[in-house]
UniProtKB/Swiss-Prot annotation:
It comes from Danio rerio. One of its GO terms (molecular function) is GTP binding. Keywords: Elongation factor, GTP-binding, Hydrolase, Mitochondrion, Nucleotide-binding, Protein biosynthesis, Transit peptide. Mitochondrial GTPase that catalyzes the GTP-dependent ribosomal translocation step during translation elongation. During this step, the ribosome changes from the pre-translocational (PRE) to the post-translocational (POST) state as the newly formed A-site-bound peptidyl-tRNA and P-site-bound deacylated tRNA move to the P and E sites, respectively. Catalyzes the coordinated movement of the two tRNA molecules, the mRNA and conformational changes in the ribosome. Does not mediate the disassembly of ribosomes from messenger RNA at the termination of mitochondrial protein biosynthesis. Disulfide bonds: none annotated. The keyword Hydrolase applies. This is Elongation factor G, mitochondrial. InterPro entries: EFG_II, EFG_III, EFG_III/V, EFG_IV, EFG_V, EFG_V-like, EFTu-like_2, G_TR_CS. It is an enzyme of class 3 (hydrolase).
Length: 745
């Protein structure tokens, strides 16, 4: 009945493309019955740098496939806002904050789409999406080309082996240059890429596109470009189209053995040969097809949808593994998931995102094997808990459709399930399986937060509790020295958004403190230790002795803390080794210089001693802590600071002022680019020096400059900066540095 009501209301709303709507409803019904074969399913994400047009593109996709009745613009200029930006803050700011999931039909294929944020502060949303998707569309701006966050998204897609198409958007913008964007795709991202279609005209003269494989031009008619018309290639563009097609064949031949043989034998590939070769190379991630268009002007979206079906993999063409954790084994073995869409195999699914909805906690799940039915009992591999599926839904932004069953390859959501992001759910008879976890970056910035009204403390703790469950990059702790609640995240915007959500969703206005950088402390060289913890107070006492080395890790592992047990024999019984490790990790929570965490170190336990009566777990915890403190007293300790990769775009006349500003902030310029009266500056700048840069850049470029930044690495800070940080810490904790007191006297 619910589906019939949805169908009748959607039919009343929908005006253009009635046949498409009918197809959607019939197909949605077949999806919920689980009979759509794998070959007709695509799980894709749309990712890019901020303001490349991802959400606008998704809006067009939903309109052309009959999923929505009318289109709206991203910033809510028409008072509505994009369907996929369902959060009020998203419509107000014109940015995507959370990943939004939807599904639609195109040419009898079911496409699950996740629209992801472009802002680096919300990078965990992109990580989650790519982990569970089979393919992706990387959107590039025809003016900006490959930008800061594009590089990050490319790295994330490589981490999860996600094949992707590239869509060069915004060809209608002044200064659009798709050739430069393609060149940057090859040089900056090291991708084997080539045009699959090219534009007819640019900027205000964009009339259509040329399909290089089918060798025809495509024109988009109608008020919203919904009518696609095919014509011959215009005579003035035949030469360029032939050259670009030859370039496409050569690039694919380098990546595909079958087409490579045809190329060497000088045989002309047919349209089907070329499409099959492009698909094989794309699925292997050895080639990326490049499509062009303008989502805002409704051009090039339908060919992109065709390319998603033709070139991106279905769930059977992607190998997904679960880890089988056998008892007594430190490392689990990998098990290949069976993506057959039936109930012959036991269910395995991954909870990749949590969201608090109107009806309770919503858990997004990707089904990797078997099927999940409403009322089924499933097991959480991490906690061992058994939970019942009370309600199973498919999502369209913030709207839902109830379904009875979800099969392998489907993305669905569950209600009322208590879990954390990254948990694996399994059927009862394979509860020791777990999917590979999602990579969670470390927070780089912290702020103190408190409610404006002291009576709202409960609301604050309730909101923070929910946000930390939803977002693994959002952390919170209570500072016992300053008696403040400290929240940590990926950037100022990240924490600012949560502060605003606290006010909107919990009626709890908050006051934020000044941003604090997440410094770290580390050693410069290895230091041996030999520490004995001994305590005797009548009766059984405490005794534990540890011998070993505290050594620094290489610069790539500055954020890690490692423990290595190299003991031989029973001087330290094996049951006490975890206690030594706990003591070591506890001691690393607070460094000796400025009280920040110690990282980039390895604790190597080589030997020790125990007492038959007095040795216990607490003894070796204290011994581990004491060993770290002893080693740090003898070591040279340095402060590590997060360094950001910054990309600045501004008019050429302000180049000198911008470079001077970067130098003042201890930045190191790594490269420069320029086109159409604008220059792009690439630099590595310490995060501690980036506060207030937005205001400075606007001031020195008359409001015409903009910048983006993302976390790059940790590195030792300059000696003068370290001295300044240590002095500030000593002043804040009530200790005056000896140097300053002498100077005052």
């Amino acid at each position: 009945m619910r589906l019939l009501r949805a169908a009748s209301s959607l039919a009343r709303l929908h005006r253009p493309g009635h046949s498409t709507l009918q197809q959607v409803l019939i197909s949605c019904r077949s999806c919920s019955n689980g009979i759509t074969p794998n070959e007709r399913i695509r799980n894709i994400g749309i990712s890019a740098h901020i303001d490349s047009g991802k959400t606008t593109l998704t809006e067009r996709v939903l309109y052309y496939t009959g999923r929505i009745a009318e289109m709206h613009e991203v910033r809510g200029k028409d008072g509505v806002g994009a369907i996929m930006d369902s959060m009020e803050l998203e419509r107000q700011r014109g940015i995507t904050i959370q990943s939004a999931a939807t599904y639609t039909m195109w040419k009898n294929h079911n496409i699950n789409i996740i629209d992801t944020p472009g802002h680096v502060d919300f990078t965990i949303e992109v990580e989650r999406s790519l982990r569970v998707l089979d393919g992706a569309v990387l959107v590039l701006c025809a003016v900006g080309g490959v930008q800061c966050q594009t590089v990050t998204v490319n790295r994330q897609m490589k981490r999860y082996s996600v094949p992707f198409l590239t869509f060069i958007n915004k060809l209608d913008r002044l200064g659009a240059n798709p050739n430069r964007a393609l060149q940057q795709l090859r040089t900056k991202l090291n991708q084997n890429a080539a045009f699959v279609n090219i534009p007819i005209g640019l900027e205000g003269n964009l009339r259509g596109i040329i399909d290089l494989i089918e060798e025809r031009s495509i024109v988009f008619d109608g008020p919203f470009g919904e009518s696609v018309r095919y014509e011959d290639i215009p005579p003035e563009m035949r030469s360029e189209a032939a050259d670009r097609r030859q370039e496409l064949v050569e690039c694919v031949a380098n990546a595909d053995e079958t087409l490579g043989e045809m190329f060497l034998e000088e045989r002309v590939p047919t349209v089907l040969d070329l499409k099959a070769a492009v698909r094989r190379a794309t699925v292997k991630r050895s080639f990326s097809p490049v499509l062009v268009g303008s989502a805002l002007k409704n051009k090039g979206v339908q060919p992109l949808l065709d390319a998603v079906l033709e070139y991106l993999p279905n769930p059977t063409e992607v190998q997904n593994y679960a880890i089988l954790n056998e008892e007594g084994e430190s490392e689990g073995s990998k098990i290949l998931m069976d993506s057959t869409r039936d109930d012959t195999q036991p269910f395995v699914g991954l909870a990749f995102k949590l969201e608090a909805g109107r009806f309770g906690q919503l858990t997004y799940v990707r089904v990797y094997q078997g099927c999940l039915r409403k009322t089924d009992y499933i097991h959480n591999s991490r906690t061992g808990r058994r939970v019942r599926v009370q309600r199973l839904v498919r999502l369209h932004a913030d709207q839902m459709e109830d379904v009875e069953v979800a099969y392998a390859g489907d993305i669905c959501a569950l209600f009322g399930i208590d879990c954390a992001s990254g948990d694996t759910f399994t059927a009862r008879n394979n509860a020791n399986l777990s999917m590979e976890s999602i990579h969670v970056p470390e927070p780089v910035i912290s702020m103190a937060i408190r409610p404006s009204n002291k009576n709202d403390t409960d609301k604050l703790s309730k909101g923070i509790s929910r946000f930390t469950r939803e977002d693994p990059t959002f952390r919170v702790h209570f500072d016992t020295e300053s008696k403040e609640t400290i929240i940590s995240g990926m950037g100022e915007l990240h924490l600012e958004i949560y502060s605003q959500r606290m006010e909107r969703e919990y009626s709890c206005p908050c006051v934020m403190g000044k941003p604090k950088v997440a410094f770290r402390e580390t050693l410069t060289s290895a230091v041996p230790f030999e520490y004995t913890h001994k305590k005797q107070s009548g009766g059984s006492g405490q005794y534990g002795k540890v011998i070993g080395v505290l050594e620094p890790l290489d610069s790539e592992n500055y954020t890690k803390v490692e423990f290595s047990d190299e003991t031989v024999g029973t001087n330290i019984p094996k049951q006490f080794v975890p206690a030594v490790e706990k003591g070591f990790r506890d001691a690393c929570e607070k460094g000796p210089l400025i009280g920040h965490k110690i990282s980039g170190v390895r604790f190597v336990l080589e030997d020790g001693a125990h007492h038959m009566v007095d040795s216990n777990e607490i003894s070796f915890i204290r011994a581990g802590e004491g060993a770290v403190k002893q080693a740090l007293e003898k070591a040279t300790v340095v402060i590590l600071e997060p360094v950001m990769s910054v990309e600045i775009v501004a008019p050429n006349e302000f180049q000198g002022a911008v470079i001077a500003g970067v130098n003042r902030r201890h930045g190191v310029i790594s490269g420069q680019d320029g086109a159409d009266g604008y220059f792009t500056l690439y630099a590595d700048i310490p995060l501690n020096d980036m506060f207030g840069y937005a205001t400075e850049l606007r001031s020195c470029t008359e409001g015409k400059g903009e910048y983006t930044m993302e976390y790059s690495r940790y590195q030792p800070c300059a000696a003068s900066v370290q001295e300044d940080l240590v002095n500030k810490h000593l002043e804040a904790t009530g200790q005056l540095p000896a140097k300053k007191s002498k100077w005052k006297n």
